[in-house]
Amino acid sequence: VVALTVQAPAAASSLSAIRHWVFDMDGTLTVAVHDFARIKRELAIPQEDDILTHLAGLPAAEASAKHAWLLAHERALAAASQPATGAVALVRALQGAGCRLGILTRNVRSLAQVTLQAIGLGDVFAEDDIIGRDEAEPKPSPAGLQYFQQRWQVEPAQVVMVGDYRFDLECGRAAGSRTLLVNAPDNPWPGMACWHLADCGAVLERWRH
């Protein structure tokens, strides 16, 4: 019930050897609640477009208004966040073992902090270990992950990027780090994750052994 797949790039080291962990937020540490199709309809964004990329290409006034709507929508969701299966236990176990932990989200830092507070992890991550879309170019850009590599003074392969979507995997691979996919049972992106496990609870079990 735990193992799904382990790709060849992970063979050189076990998950338990990883001491530097960067987590996506929404859908990884929390139960996914964003209705991206609805957001795109509300903001008149084509369904096939990425929201942040689309907004970045708009005239300043229009982009500002739409970012304000998006922020208000995200704020309401953040306050009501629920932890994903095993997420709190995994983060607490890694914290207890002295691992370095970071958050890399396409949301904004202040709302990531609201979310962490809502799911009971508000005391774990220092402000500088929470990187949102205003601190670094958003995923799939590797910029945010490269920030953590430099901040922690570690080689890229010593860091694992944990997420539930292809942008997390693309970010990790572009930065030269390990990649761990959770909460995506069918794995629509084969070959991109070093590890593919059911959820954070399964990650904790694998990490312990």
Give the residues covered by each predicted segment:
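Hydrophobic residues in well-ordered beta-strands that form the structural core
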Residues: 31, 103-105, 181
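Short, basic/glycine-rich phosphate-binding loops at helix/coil junctions
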Residues: 63-74, 124-129
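Asp-based, Mg2+/Mn2+-dependent phosphohydrolase catalytic module
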Residues: 1-21, 109, 115-209
